[in-house]
């Protein structure tokens, strides 16, 4: 989590000042973002990727090692107020953990002008927490979101979709 660094704003400012750097992006779980969002934007950070694997407060505490979901929302709101060029939310889907939240996570694109990106869990041999049943394919995401409409590719690696009345896209990574 980069925001635990007390000097993260000056680090980002230094990176943005390097000749040839066209864009500075930051990935965070957003729990520490609210107090520094405007400063990060002023330092030259143009895009954010916010990790949010669950919207259940108890599961959120578990997956982030005691993070508070409310702090994520405060960070998201602060990021929107700071007017970053693009904000993307990332969720790694895990069978038996958050696969029941596909619709609620996707619906964040109806409430906020953000993209929601679903990332397939990387297969890990002999992982103590995630067996083969933990893998959730992007086809399963589309089954949960039958109203999602295919969008034109934006040059990235995700397959893009949009829900009716959404403010952002849904990206699927496989």
Cite the ranges covered by each PLM segment.
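Auxiliary Fe-S-binding modules of radical SAM enzymes
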Residues: 111, 121-124, 128-174
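Radical SAM/AdoMet-radical enzyme domain recognition
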Residues: 5-109, 115
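Glycine-rich, proline-tolerant flexible connector loops at the mouths of alpha/beta enzymes
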Residues: 1-2
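Glycine-rich beta-alpha junction loops
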Residues: 93-97, 120-125
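Generic beta-structure capping elements
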Residues: 51-55, 119-121, 173
